[in-house]
């Protein structure tokens, strides 16, 4: 047993990845000027993951999203031909938002200001009192398109008028590793949202390492991700994948809820290594869990994986399915956080009970994390400390900062990806 656990933590990943081992400045968490550079150099040039295409399964389905970091409101819709398209949700007349609902189905979109009407392919088809306009041509006044691509069911957009690289080039080795994953229950998300008084990276950091779990989450999931053999929750695996990164977290295979915790003991899933991250025994999970990218070490002591899709999304895998974390910056010190948990429909009362237990525990853990990052942001803003000191199991945070530094300084996206 000790020989197996001795190999849990990747050794020298920081050095092998060519990363510095020195302190990391906190300036990017608190500087309005650095945030302005991130807006232009990162978020306006990178491919941004918005969600799953299952959110708009039918022709005419649409969703709208605020992308505050780019001062944009985006309309994503599915055409009659089944293609996913994206547009700036801005009327060609005088700039009003055309669609005010967060989601729905429509063959046409009518701006509420003056009833200018657009088909869901973006073309302008109706203008009241059109003859009173001067030298007017509807063909030149459609909704402004946004580059959009779907990869493995994930919808990405690029807000640059002409993206400098394709989505496939942007994803790089991440796309190779994650290709072909059969995502279970991708059309059934449970959504958790919160506006947080913290820089987006401060929140993201909390999900890029497991070092804090035995301490911060001692009363919730601490003993799920740590054990006497692995008291500091060392990782099973860590990989730097171009601009992106993977962490695979240890799970205590001998975890059992305390006798006093009768609710969790009642719902405990004895078929998984980490009961609080497992919520179903759906057969669809079998092929998902067998995929090489899910639990890549195929360890029996596994809790979850976290794939960080640069810059702002984590896709997490666990024994019971998958979930995402989105970190949308709203200012240099505020973030709109969104989590989506994809769980299969419960086949039994016991499975439904475990799902409810999973969500309630997830909310508990999120509250611990989000309260802590707000305190962390205040600490950084005090400027009492100018640097962070990161250890080996925080390598993903270091890699994120290295990647951001390249993007902020690079004159082209291809240079940033090199």
Language-model segments: which ranges?
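Short, contiguous pre-domain boundary segments
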Residues: 9-25, 184
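Short linear motifs in intrinsically disordered
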Residues: 51-58, 136-138, 302-306, 340
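C-terminal catalytic domain of Rieske-type non-heme iron oxygenases
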Residues: 83, 89, 149, 154-418
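General detector of N-terminal leader/presequence modules that precede the first folded domain
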Residues: 1-15, 360
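Rieske [2Fe-2S] iron-sulfur-binding domain
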Residues: 55-177
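Generic structural signal for secondary-structure transition and capping sites
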Residues: 43-47, 96, 212
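Non-catalytic accessory segments flanking enzyme active sites
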Residues: 26-70, 74-75
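Short Pro/Gly-enriched beta-strand edge/turn motifs at strand-loop
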Residues: 45-51, 57-58, 127-131, 307-311
């Amino acid at each position: 047993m000790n020989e197996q656990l001795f190999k849990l933590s990747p050794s020298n990943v920081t050095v092998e990845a060519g990363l510095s081992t020195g302190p990391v400045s906190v300036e990017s968490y608190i500087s309005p000027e650095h945030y302005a550079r991130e807006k232009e150099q990162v978020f306006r040039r990178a491919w941004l993951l918005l969600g799953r295409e299952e959110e708009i399964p039918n022709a005419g389905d649409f969703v709208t999203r605020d992308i505050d970091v780019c001062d944009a409101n985006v309309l994503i819709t599915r055409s009659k031909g089944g293609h996913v398209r994206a547009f700036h949700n801005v009327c060609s007349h005088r700039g009003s938002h055309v669609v005010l609902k967060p989601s729905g189905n429509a063959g046409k979109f009518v701006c509420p200001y003056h009833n200018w009407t657009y088909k869901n392919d973006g073309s302008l088809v109706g203008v009241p009192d059109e003859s009173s306009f001067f030298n007017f041509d509807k063909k030149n006044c459609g909704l402004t398109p946004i580059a959009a691509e779907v990869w493995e069911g994930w919808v990405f957009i690029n807000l640059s008028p002409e993206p400098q690289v394709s989505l496939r080039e942007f994803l790089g080795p991440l796309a190779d590793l994650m290709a072909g994953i059969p995502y279970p229950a991708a059309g059934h998300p449970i959504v958790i949202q919160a506006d947080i008084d913290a820089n987006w990276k401060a929140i993201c950091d909390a999900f890029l390492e497991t070092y804090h779990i035995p301490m911060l989450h001692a009363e919730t999931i601490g003993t799920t991700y740590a054990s006497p053999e692995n008291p500091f929750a060392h990782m099973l695996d860590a990989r730097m994948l171009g601009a992106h990164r993977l962490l695979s977290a240890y799970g205590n295979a001998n975890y059992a809820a305390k006798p006093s915790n009768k609710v969790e003991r009642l719902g405990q899933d004895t078929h998984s290594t980490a009961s609080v991250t497992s919520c179903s025994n759906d057969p669809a999970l079998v092929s998902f869990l067998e995929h090489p990218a899910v639990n890549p070490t195929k360890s029996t002591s596994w809790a979850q994986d976290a794939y960080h899709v640069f810059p702002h999304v984590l896709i997490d895998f666990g024994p019971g399915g998958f979930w995402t974390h989105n970190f949308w910056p709203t200012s240099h010190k505020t973030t709109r956080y969104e989590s989506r948990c994809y769980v299969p429909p419960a086949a039994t009362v016991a499975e439904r009970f475990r799902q409810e237990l999973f969500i309630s525990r997830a909310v508990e853990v999120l509250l611990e994390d989000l309260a802590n990052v707000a305190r962390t942001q205040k600490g950084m803003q005090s400027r009492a400390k100018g640097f962070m000191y990161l250890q080996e199991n925080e390598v993903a945070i270091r890699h994120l900062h290295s990647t951001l530094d390249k993007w902020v300084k690079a004159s082209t996206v291809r240079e940033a990806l090199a």
